[in-house]
């Protein structure tokens, strides 16, 4: 069952182009209700959810990344929500959001670009998520290996074959 609303690209589609799947949208509506889905939804990689601890992400880090994902509509257009908006969504002061986002930047998950208005003053920053994508790709490989190891261990257990252990256990 497709729940992301997105199908793999067809042969005649460009590399980053995707096709909406009406069945996927119907599936989301069946789960959440039409009124909820009408307000929008965000695709979140399971790797971000499953490997957040391995990535060294706090709950607030993940919440902020989820908000950035909410505003990231196109791979070539970085999201640009204001710290005020992010703070309102997670119930934190702008100073807390600033510190957390600085940490995400230090860890290489996001890259902040300051934007300035033509008449002077600063506008909302844009946030490139290339670092997050790269780290999730790395973690996805680790997750796949972990799942394969578990699958092999489960098969051994079903056959009654002992699982090899390392010295010191």
Positions of predicted regions on the chain:
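Short alpha-helical linear motifs
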Residues: 88-90, 105-107, 121-126
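Short, intrinsically disordered/low-complexity patches at protein termini
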Residues: 98-99, 112, 121-122, 135, ...
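Basic, gly/Ser/Thr/Pro-rich low-complexity segments located predominantly at protein N termini
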Residues: 45-48, 113, 126
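Short, cationic-aromatic polyanion-contact patches
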Residues: 82, 115-137
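Charged low-complexity intrinsically disordered patches
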Residues: 1-37, 106, 131-169
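Short recognition helix of helix-turn-helix/winged-helix DNA-binding domains
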Residues: 1-89, 95-96, 102
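Short, charged low-complexity intrinsically disordered segments located at boundaries
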Residues: 77, 92-100, 116, 131-136
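A short, conserved structural fragment
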Residues: 106-115
């Amino acid at each position: 069952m497709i729940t992301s609303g997105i199908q793999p690209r067809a042969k005649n589609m460009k590399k980053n182009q995707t096709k909406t799947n009406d069945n996927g949208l119907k599936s989301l509506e069946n789960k959440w209700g039409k009124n909820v889905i009408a307000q929008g939804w965000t695709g979140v990689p399971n790797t971000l959810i499953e490997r957040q601890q391995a990535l060294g992400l706090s709950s607030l880090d993940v919440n902020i990344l989820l908000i950035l994902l909410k505003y990231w509509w196109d791979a070539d257009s970085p999201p640009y929500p204001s710290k005020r908006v992010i703070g309102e969504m997670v119930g934190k002061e702008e100073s807390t959001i600033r510190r957390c986002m600085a940490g995400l930047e230090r860890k290489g998950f996001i890259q902040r670009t300051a934007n300035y208005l033509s008449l002077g003053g600063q506008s909302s920053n844009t946030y490139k998520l290339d670092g997050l994508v790269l780290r999730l790709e790395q973690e996805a490989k680790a997750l796949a290996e972990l799942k394969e190891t578990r699958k092999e261990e489960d098969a051994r257990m079903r056959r009654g074959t002992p699982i090899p252990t390392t010295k010191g256990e």
